[in-house]
């Protein structure tokens, strides 16, 4: 009798244990709430250790952005969008589809719709500007404006679009911001659709530039160029005489050139027009191109569209493929790691006769130019 009861009790216990196991394995864990999803996703972006990616990472952003606690779903999506933008391939490249073909034009553009500002200084008029007038500026003088700090009769004979800025000739952040302020005001007065800034050591491929800008409506907020840093710049913003706060943002380096749509430029007015650009630059105590990024990204919340079609002397220009020169918007020359830095291109001119390679590039793009030798340009 006792043995029979013991067996029944044992079978009942085993059955109960099996039922519990079935319930536990069949019932999934509770779904995390949206805020918890946000925290987990941001931790996965930051890495298992919770640290931000290193400088060499494609998703290099301000570490404080990735590891701080997220308190709302909207905040999470804002941070995640920024991190994904850093991890994605450079858009421009951003103006191109995955198959390598240009995006369909958003509007029809002509050269008269674009305002190209070339920043220079008196001492470089002969050494740099003469080369630009001989090459790319010769194609569209009417859309190109020279912003300089000194009068020059010889320069005035080249073009009527010379703007004397009354700014210092020094290469200081104040002098650079002074010239940018004049550039901005002249663009607004012009009524043109696009503002593009370049330096006097840039070659501008006008066909590629128009093709790129036509991909975006000029009435929308568009800020396109190439950053020289692999993460947002961190600055100190002066709020009042005794108060400052940290601020971080992306900016397109002026040495590669950048473009801004008229729709966005008009929104920049409170911080850029009528001399306000200088006072805005003093708030962060950084040069002109950084100040543009500060106004656009930090104050207006418009993200930089990063394009691999802009190039400065700060990068290794030897890596620009000759077969893709016709697609590049800007090129440059100078020194890189104590070596001569220019696009590697075979052409009718030797390196000694054409150290910048701008003449060879121009003949490659425009072989019908009268002074280009009638030889095969590789």
From Swiss-Prot:
Per the UniProt entry, the disulfide pairs are: 167-178, 196-259, 363-372
Q: Give the protein name, as stated in the record.
A: Beta-1,3-N-acetylglucosaminyltransferase lunatic fringe
Subcellular location(s) per record: Golgi apparatus; Golgi apparatus membrane
Which residues are listed under the site Cleavage? 85-86
Annotated binding of substrate, by residue? 128, 200
Renumbered to this chain, region (Disordered) spans 85-108
| Top-level taxon of the source organism | Eukaryota
Which coarse location class applies to the principal site listed for this UniProt protein?
Golgi
Q: Which residues lie on this side of the membrane: Lumenal?
A: 30-378
- Which Pfam family, just one, is annotated for this protein? Fringe
Q: Which UniProt keywords apply?
A: Developmental protein, Disulfide bond, Glycoprotein, Glycosyltransferase, Golgi apparatus, Manganese, Membrane, Metal-binding, Signal-anchor, Transferase, Transmembrane, Transmembrane helix
Q: Which GO terms describe its cellular component?
A: Golgi membrane
State the organism's lineage: Eukaryota, Metazoa, Chordata, Craniata, Vertebrata
Active-site residues, record numbering mapped to chain: 289
Q: Where does Mn(2+) bind?
A: 201, 313
Q: Does the keyword Membrane apply?
A: yes
Q: Give residue ranges on the Cytoplasmic side.
A: 1-8
Task: From the UniProt record, list the coiled-coil ranges.
Answer: none
What does the Swiss-Prot or TrEMBL cofactor note state? Manganese is the most effective. Can also use cobalt with lower efficiency. Has some activity with magnesium and calcium, but not zinc.
What reactions does this protein catalyze? Answer: 3-O-(alpha-L-fucosyl)-L-threonyl-[EGF-like domain protein] + UDP-N-acetyl-alpha-D-glucosamine = 3-O-(N-acetyl-beta-D-glucosaminyl-(1->3)-alpha-L-fucosyl)-L-threonyl-[EGF-like domain protein] + UDP + H(+); 3-O-(alpha-L-fucosyl)-L-seryl-[EGF-like domain protein] + UDP-N-acetyl-alpha-D-glucosamine = 3-O-(N-acetyl-beta-D-glucosaminyl-(1->3)-alpha-L-fucosyl)-L-seryl-[EGF-like domain protein] + UDP + H(+)
Q: What membrane topology does this protein have?
A: Single-pass type II membrane protein
Q: Which residues cross the membrane?
A: 9-29
Q: Carries keyword Disulfide bond?
A: yes
**Which family is this sequence assigned to?**
Belongs to the glycosyltransferase 31 family.
Gene Ontology terms: biological process? compartment pattern specification; marginal zone B cell differentiation; negative regulation of Notch signaling pathway involved in somitogenesis; ovarian follicle development; positive regulation of meiotic cell cycle; positive regulation of Notch signaling pathway; regulation of Notch signaling pathway; regulation of somitogenesis
What does it do? Glycosyltransferase that initiates the elongation of O-linked fucose residues attached to EGF-like repeats in the extracellular domain of Notch molecules. Modulates NOTCH1 activity by modifying O-fucose residues at specific EGF-like domains resulting in inhibition of NOTCH1 activation by JAG1 and enhancement of NOTCH1 activation by DLL1 via an increase in its binding to DLL1. Decreases the binding of JAG1 to NOTCH2 but not that of DLL1. Essential mediator of somite segmentation and patterning.
Q: Which InterPro entries match?
A: Fringe (IPR017374), Fringe-like_glycosylTrfase (IPR003378)
């Amino acid at each position: 009798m006792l043995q029979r009861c013991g067996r029944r009790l044992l079978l009942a216990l085993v059955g109960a244990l099996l039922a519990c196991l079935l319930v536990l394995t069949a019932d999934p864990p509770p779904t995390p709430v949206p805020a918890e999803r946000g925290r987990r996703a941001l931790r996965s972006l930051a890495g298992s250790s919770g640290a931000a990616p290193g400088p060499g990472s494609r998703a290099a952003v301000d570490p404080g952005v990735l590891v701080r606690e997220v308190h709302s779903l909207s905040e999470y999506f804002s941070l995640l969008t920024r991190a994904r933008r850093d991890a994605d391939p450079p858009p421009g490249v951003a103006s191109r589809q995955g198959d390598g073909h240009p995006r369909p034009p958003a509007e029809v553009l002509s050269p008269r719709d674009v305002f190209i500002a070339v920043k220079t200084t008196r001492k470089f008029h002969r050494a740099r500007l003469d080369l630009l007038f001989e090459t790319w500026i010769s194609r569209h003088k009417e859309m190109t404006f020279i912003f300089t700090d000194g009068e020059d009769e010889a320069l005035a004979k080249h073009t009527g679009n010379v703007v004397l800025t009354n700014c210092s000739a020094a290469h200081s952040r104040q002098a650079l911001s002074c010239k940018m302020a004049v550039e901005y005001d002249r663009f607004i007065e012009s009524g043109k659709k696009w503002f593009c800034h370049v330096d006097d050591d840039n070659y501008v491929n006008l066909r590629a530039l128009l093709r790129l800008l036509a991909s975006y409506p000029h009435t929308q907020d568009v800020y396109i160029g190439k950053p020289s840093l692999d993460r947002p710049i961190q600055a100190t913003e002066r709020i009042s005489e005794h108060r400052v706060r940290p601020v971080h943002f992306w900016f397109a380096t002026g040495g590669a050139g950048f473009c801004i749509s008229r729709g966005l430029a008009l929104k920049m007015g409170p911080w850029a027009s009528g001399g306000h650009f200088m006072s805005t630059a003093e708030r962060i105590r950084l040069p002109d191109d950084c100040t543009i990024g500060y106004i656009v990204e930090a104050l207006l919340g418009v993200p930089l569209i990063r394009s691999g079609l802009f190039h400065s002397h700060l990068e290794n220009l030897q890596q620009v493929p000759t077969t893709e020169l016709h697609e590049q918007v800007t090129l440059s020359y100078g020194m890189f790691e104590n070596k001569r830095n220019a696009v590697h291109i075979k052409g009718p001119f030797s390196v000694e006769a054409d150290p910048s390679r701008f003449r060879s590039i121009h003949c490659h793009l425009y072989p019908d130019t009268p002074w280009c030798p009638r030889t095969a340009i590789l």
